[in-house]
Amino acid sequence: MREDRSMKKYIFPIIAIVLGCSSCDSFLEKTPKDRLVPETYFKTENDLKMFSNSFYDNLLDKTPYDEQSDVMFEKGTISDELLGGTAREVPQAAASGGWSWGQLRKINTMLGHMDQCTDAEVAKQYTGLAKFFRTQFYFQKVMRFGDVPWYDKELGSRDSSLYKARDSRELVMSNMLNDIDDAIESLPSGKSVYRVNKWAALMLKAQFCLYEGTFRKYHNVTLPGHSAEDYLKLAYQAAEQVMNSGVYSLASDYHELFREPDADQNEYILAIRMEQSIGCTHSATSYVAMNTGGNPGFSKKFIDSFLMKDGTRYTDKPDWETKLFVEEVADRDPRLGMIIRLPQSIRVNSKKTIYGPELTMTSTGFQLEKFVMDPQYETAERANMSFNDIPVYRLGEAYLMFAEAKAELNILTQEDVDNSINKLRDRVGMPHLVLAGLTVDPFLTSETYGYQNLAKLNPSNLAQILEVRRERTIEMALEGRRWNDIVRWKEGATWTEPLYGMYFPGPGAYDLTGDGNADVYLYATAKVDNAVKKQYGDNFTYLQIQEIEIDGKYVPYSDGIILSEGTKGFVAMHYKKARAFDESRDYLYPIPSGDRQLNPNLAQNNGWADGLDF
């Protein structure tokens, strides 16, 4: 399951790190809760700060990778969510699979004792902080499970409310709106990249309102209270406040923004701080640069969505699907070369100089570059040793949420685009998005690669919505948004689209660096021909094109490569893995059967069979 895999695998060993790494020595570790007497605590700012440090732990699911999505996946395995069907099961253990509530109990405990604080202004600020985290906690729960029980006070072990049914989605969302508005009013407005402030609260509001507005729109959900349009309006208004605050500005270099050790305090609104000296690290670089790191790669679909640097569509070119790598990535949106390794990419460390992508280190040939630290920080290439800060919210996302909410309401103007998306394009030297004369991109609506649900709905401003989605997918790549974007847009069919990579027309030598010399040789025989080895030498990359099936049995790769059409086609390491998506079931996760046994009033989400008949 996504929540269980994410930070354990990609961020750092299981230590209690929070923003600023403060929980490494937090009060909650020094003083276990069974020795904390609430009635005599929560009196000073230091009490509140130390207790609330652990709230930041909940931000740690903000991974630097979309490790299960249609745009990026690993070489050896793909997630249960991408496999779908019987690969997805109802968890049995109580409090597993994301159905855990300990963090909420801590938040409600502090709120319940806030009147003990002797400083009214401090109490107001920390009330706002707690309500921010309660909103964030419930946002994660609603995205994962839909209806959930709402609790706004600490409950005793015998309280009957522990066994109540799930509350309606609208009740929970309305309470979240009340909480986040209190947080916006109460939190400080100064920059504090490692601590929650007013602007982080506005980003959270924009984020969950955009999610809810689009979820209700595309899933056709109508509930008493707020409408989809209400949430979309709240989303763009919150994002606009951040945009117009004058507090933040875009960093000048998109590439460096994600690989510098310290968070850019102009663009980053809230970040997870990493500190190598005390072991607060993650594995973004080693995940890409080591054989044991997962060997992730971007899908061809993602690469093909990038425009040419002159603003025209790559997929309008003749034979676009079967162009070789060097030609395929030439003259594209400059962000492509900041997100993947291009032919001219050079990486130097103490062991070797690496040119272009390393085909053996990626599932598709399209090797990740974003979040990979500069080679000068060589220790980052060791397992779990990257120390560049991870963004939670940044100004670039505010621009995208603003534009998307307005597009979904069909009120997006050229002025809106110039104040949002075109600022992101200006940063990398891309031509502006111009709404006048905009036409639908067939690639983005195709059955093979496109948004099929949106294409069927065919709204009057289809072209606008598609271009906003293109921009979001590119700009926010690897920032942990893609899965939930697909859910809220009701585009689950994209998870069954082909997981393809680079195209190779057959065995032979291929240039991946654009210098006219071969870098890799693909062969479809039992071993490399001696004449070929003599020509290219031993210090060269040879990859066997492996048979997908032999005598009716699927043969997995070892050090070879699988192509979609046998000895030619797209890199397709997961070609024979059956994948499915159940539109009636898979947009929500199941509640663990153990929790339903403890509380029979909890109804199971539709389509999830757990063997419990009540």
Which stretches of residues belong to each language-model region?
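C-terminal motif of bacterial Sec signal peptides marking the signal peptidase cleavage site
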Residues: 21-23
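Long, intrinsically disordered, low-complexity segments
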Residues: 100-101, 175, 259-307, 425, ...
